[in-house]
Amino acid sequence: MNNLKRLTKTIFSCFTLSALLLLAGCETLPPMTDLSPITVTDARQATAWELQGKLAIKTPDDKLSANIYWRHSKDRDELTLTTMLGTTVLTLNSTPNSAHLHIDGKDFRDDNAQRLLERVSGWSIPLADLPLWITGQVGPNDQVIARDSQGKPKQLTNTQTPPPWQVAFLSWQSQSGASVPHQLKLERGDLQLKLQLNQWQALGKPAILVGEQP
């Protein structure tokens, strides 16, 4: 059984179990207590954010759909995939120098999150570039192929590793005061990812009022 089929089976099993248990045992990420929701006028102003949405992964042999929850900051990332009923089936927690993946009751570790995810799941997902694309930004290895009438990227090619990633920004939305993508489609060879951001929240340090102790 290939890795994607194994993960698909895991998600289906968790979905069935959660239906029987009426959501008993659902897991959630601990809150980032040092960060609070903020409003920005440009997504580039947010050094940290969290999102909720849906992720679809498709290969010639299989396909997978899951809810995605992602908290991102410059120091760490916390990514979770769940069934439609909310049961956690995969968590990936990482810092610039370490990564921990929990899936199917097993724990895996590496010093690189992207390499770890590819080794265990078989997915070559550009985790280092996704935070830029999720906020509508373009990286140094990205070549913009087309822009919309407002100058936002509509399609780009990432040339860092062959074959290149083709990224399409299908729609945009206003979240936390900024314009961010609503739907993204990523293609590389025979691997296709679709990401829908249902909620994107910019995060920052809580403001300290005059007279309060820091």
From Swiss-Prot:
Coiled coil: none
Subcellular location: Cell outer membrane
Keyword Ribosomal protein: no
Biological processes, Gene Ontology terms: lipoprotein localization to outer membrane; protein transport
Main location: membrane
GO cellular component: cell outer membrane
Lipid linkage positions (N-palmitoyl cysteine): C26
Pfam families the record matches: LolB
Signal peptide (residue range): 1-25
SUPFAM superfamilies: Prokaryotic lipoproteins and lipoprotein localization factors
Residue positions of covalent lipid attachment, annotated as S-diacylglycerol cysteine: C26
Topological category with respect to the lipid bilayer: Lipid-anchor
S-S bonds: none
Keywords in alphabetical order: Cell outer membrane, Chaperone, Lipoprotein, Membrane, Palmitate, Protein transport, Signal, Transport
NCBIfam families: lolB (TIGR00548)
Function statement: Plays a critical role in the incorporation of lipoproteins in the outer membrane after they are released by the LolA protein.
Subunit structure: Monomer.
Family: Belongs to the LolB family.
Name this polypeptide is given: Outer-membrane lipoprotein LolB
Native source organism of the sequence: Shewanella baltica (strain OS185)
Taxonomic lineage from the root: Bacteria, Pseudomonadati, Pseudomonadota, Gammaproteobacteria, Alteromonadales
